Design a protein with these regions (language model features):
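Short, glycine/acidic-enriched loop or turn micro-motifs at the edges of active sites
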Residues: 10-12, 128, 166
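Short alpha-helix plus adjacent loop in nuclease-associated cores
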Residues: 124-138
Length: 184
């Protein structure tokens, strides 16, 4: 069993994004073994196709530059590399993210690029799980949750690999307490 703790960054614009499809521009992930130990990491930029030019707002929010995504591979190649790295076809796995939006965006980009989404069948929203484990009235953001655990947020907020790392720190801290479940 592999636990794949991941985060995504997407194309974005200031204000109303109605009618604009947000594409994945960065995937960051950590592979955790059945004992709660980090095995490896995955970090790739993705070249968007619908809106290939990043907005100034997106660059400011994520620190991802136009040059970074222009030089990146397209989603279809990057997601194949991700699936190979995560051993999706070899090992049982759970995908784990902070909130349910990353799942929606991952599925949407797969559908856009005509990639089967069956491999996204086991997913856990750790934000909801954290709220239950900590008995919080309302969910917290990742940075707040990290700092609430007495941990300094490491890296740059809204960079997929850094957000995934901080999420991994929370996931491994409470490793035996999560109620992981399969979605369909």
């Amino acid at each position: 069993m592999n636990y794949i703790v991941f985060d995504l960054e997407l194309t974005c614009w200031e204000g109303d994004m109605a009618g604009r499809f947000q594409e994945i521009i960065e995937i960051g992930a950590y592979k955790i073994d059945p004992y709660g130990h980090i095995q490896s990491q995955f970090s790739k930029f993705v070249k968007p196709v619908m809106y290939p030019i990043l907005s100034p707002f997106c660059t400011k929010l994520t620190s991802i530059t136009q040059e970074m995504i222009t030089q990146a591979k397209p989603f279809k190649q990057v997601i194949k590399e991700f699936m190979d790295w995560a051993e999706i076809d070899i090992e049982p796995h759970y995908l784990i993210a902070w909130g349910d939006k990353d799942l929606d965006y991952l599925k949407a980009d797969c559908l856009l690029h005509k990639i089967d989404t069956e491999w996204i069948s086991s997913y856990t929203d750790l934000k909801k799980q954290y709220q239950k484990v900590k008995k919080l009235y309302e969910p917290k953001g990742l940075k707040h949750a990290t700092e609430s655990e007495g941990l300094e947020f490491e890296g740059t907020l809204h960079r997929a690999i850094d957000d995934a790392y901080n999420l991994t720190r929370i996931f491994t801290k409470y490793f035996g307490e999560w109620n992981l479940h399969k979605i369909n």
